[in-house]
């Protein structure tokens, strides 16, 4: 038994230890000391991070020495004892198990332990056989195992081979052979990026990378420590095709350079500021929100883009790929081969980033005439950063990729206009060569084409790769404006320049030789374009129809029901435009509207002529013989200012007497509408309703349709008119042809003074009031004839007598093409129009002469009498006490009258039918410039059958007017000479449209009128054959004008007349003084009414002329009921017209 034990112990001793009785002499202390020194030198070569693990290894060696020495002493003479003590059955087995466990944990490493080191460790462990000796290694087993594991890794031969490979690849760029197809931008091991921070360093200082084992939890935790995101990089997913996950620094830099820096000279070539470049790189590393929209240094952004590609641990362009591309550059179809090499040799993320970058470089090179950066210069700047090689062939490869970008990458880049300094990358770019933008999907090898007008930033619509091959209906979307580019402050924001959308894609088959577009796609494109063209044509037709309907709505509204009065909506834009067209505006304001309205009015010209013929037929048979009552004829403006007074009588007395007389008359209500201004004496007293009324310049633009109360002076005028008409016979019988009572009218202006001695001749009442105005219903605007006689006599302005254009005319512009040219050239050139000039009203004198009436005449049919109320024109010289918008609105009355007197007679007649829309004018202007300071007019009765033309601003749609000018020079016995120039404008129509009145009472007086006219011409030593010819005609379209020795004459109204007492007022016009006069039968010069108003007030008459055409005198007008058209709804309202 003992021998067996000895054998067993000896066997264990010799199997686990190198010591034997024959080797005792060799084991000395010197050998042990050498081994200890070798062990310390080996430990000094370890990494500094593992210094704390050196102590266990040293302790193990010391224990190994102590145990070795003790075993030697014990075994020196007592073999059986040592064998028994050192032959513990558990100790070798336990140590073997520990070594096996250690080897299992280190399986993740790529190397194995050295044999010498294993033998030494086994010796050191096996020699601790004595149970009595203390073993210091037993308490520190775990640190010793870690130390042993690090020793194995350091001495591993396989890692040395890897170090050599890394040294070679860093020099030649061959490390790309270890990369995968998809470049992992988000994971880069720190031993490559940060040197020795994550790995251990050998004696040569090279970096050693660690291999990872997914089965080991310790190795996975250690691998996380060695991994981090590379800066500026974000993970690239499958949706990179939409450029949503491109690294932010590339995306923002390229967008900024595309937008602002394509024309910057030396972009990418000039060096950037190092401090600013460092600051930008730190901002991107922090990952905060960065806004480059207001950044001003383009070279720093270009330098940042180059810095990103240069500092990448792995080049984005593989070295071996560039060699293969270089080998096929000189071959045929090199572009197709290069494209195939890029698709096969690059990952998806790499291809999209390079395409995004080379798009910018190609756009820069296109504008090389401005920025001086051609293909060669750009290749020199980017080749070292993209390929990371000093091989000169890389420059040729990058240059070819930039130059042939369209055929290689399949994306179109715009040509930037040299006149601008900014190229917007967010715009839809024009297609070069008729091609459109493409995106390449590497999985199914299809190219998706985007139309240049259909580029959207809907990145979510094409996240899947299969969506690129699906086709959808083609649609055109409008190009965004250049100012609509979004700011680049969003992390994932990208310009829609290259973004794809499935709704605009068309599949294209890829072949190895060329990109063939299928016939089906071409047919679809043609069909879609045809459909779009048809849709556009239909839309244009619809828009034109709508515009025509809107234009026709104004004219067709005349034919609507005329049984009720409707007020236009507040702020009516349609009527506001009509007001502008009829007002005296500069020609540049209304040229566009005139052109449009000329086309519209010309279309309805034939219908108007038919209605005019029908109107004249009805008017000839509708002469009324009723008694003098209030007429429902709408007053265009106030007649309060026409109150006359006898010569030499105080104005205040007349004003008070008229008030007393008017208070006695019954007050009648009317549906008329007019605008009144409060009298200066009645301000604040609550008497605004009965005050006199006038208008202002600013009211020309306003449609004032408020009912007001007419002042009581109208009734007084009616009463005086009746009295004057009763006295007409007596005055006519008492006055001879040569002895006529004279009335002196003095007209005072700013620089001129005119004195007219008028000797009126009055006919009997039967000759005066025999016919009424022609008022017949028409669905279209009725023709209106107006006349104005402006007698001007200047002493200090000889230039005003040079041409008729220098005279004052109160004609206003109309939308008609026939009249707009002649009126603008002759009358509107002298108008200095001030849009917001208020009406100047005198505060001191509240009587009637302070109120102005625009130039117009209206014929009022009252019973069997037809009388005319004249209107005059004047300019105010005193400031106004009222703002144009502070006018009181009252209710009107149903009477329209004109003032008449026995000493001076004025008559004007109009054939007016008030319509809601304006019509062109029939005007006749007579301008006279006299060289004498005083004139005397002695006239005889003229024939009654003359055409009378009144002046108004109610327009008429008729052809181009005929202008006739007659000039006569006469000499009187008072040695005063005068030159009379008359211009008459009439409009010829197929049927008579002038207001020539047919009356049986005048048929017997034609011969007498001709004789009187001939006598008058003989007395003046002047023969006017035109007058005789005009008087012999019943329907004449031009007025008969007879010039006297010292004063001009006025057109004569043949039928209706009223007589107004002579009076004089102070008047001032804008250019020259004027006095209007007209008479019936007898040649009368009206007293020069001094009215304070500007020239533009003549166009106010169309403002109130908005009543519908009556169906007939005996039907709609007999009962005193006024009907008005319904106003069309307007498109928009202006706040300026919403005046209460």
Swiss-Prot record:
One protein family per Pfam: RhoGAP
Highest taxon above the source species: Eukaryota
Domain Rho-GAP: 234-409
Compositional bias annotation for Basic residues: 597-606
Keywords annotated in UniProt: Coiled coil, Cytoplasm, GTPase activation
Gene Ontology CC: cytoplasm
GO molecular function, one term: GTPase activator activity
Name listed for the protein in its UniProt record: Rho GTPase-activating protein gacF
The organism of origin for this protein: Dictyostelium discoideum (Social amoeba)
Upper taxonomic lineage: Eukaryota, Amoebozoa, Evosea, Eumycetozoa, Dictyostelia
